[in-house]
Amino acid sequence: MWNTKGAFTTIRVAGSPPKFIFFKEHLLNLNKSLKILNIDFRLTKKIFNILLSNNFTNDIKYNHLLRIAVNNKIISIDLRKRSNPNKFFKGLLVNYQRTRPEIKNLNYKKIFQFLKPLKINFEKIILYKKNFIL
């Protein structure tokens, strides 16, 4: 889905039973982005519950990230463990601001070019524009 016309949000899932951190804000921002991109879909709490019913259990103490991506044809849902950040890493400063930063869009072609040569576990890109880290 990357590099298609669409939007995404990443929600932290924590605890047992699972809690979706800042759920309302994520839903609001995702729907606002979809409207700006002229994608005729709105993710409601009801649709969210239908999509994820029976996928979470109270037996697990969650520390995960739930990514929801939407374009004109597909709704993609991905749950992955939240990794602990490495305190020691090498940063590559890149003077770049993604297109339309007010929305979390799926157009990451330029950023992927910066990521290709990096060893992802030890090296990170740090985006900046006009002397501000983004």
Regions inferred by a protein language model and the residue ranges of each:
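Periplasmic polypeptide-binding modules associated with outer-membrane biogenesis and secretion
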Residues: 61-72
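Helix-start/capping segments and mature chain N-termini
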Residues: 1-54, 71-134
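Phosphate/pyrophosphate-binding loops at sites that engage ATP/ADP/AMP, CoA/4′-phosphopantetheine
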Residues: 54-60
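Cysteine/selenocysteine-centered motifs that mediate thiol-based redox chemistry or coordinate metal-sulfur cofactors
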Residues: 35, 60-61
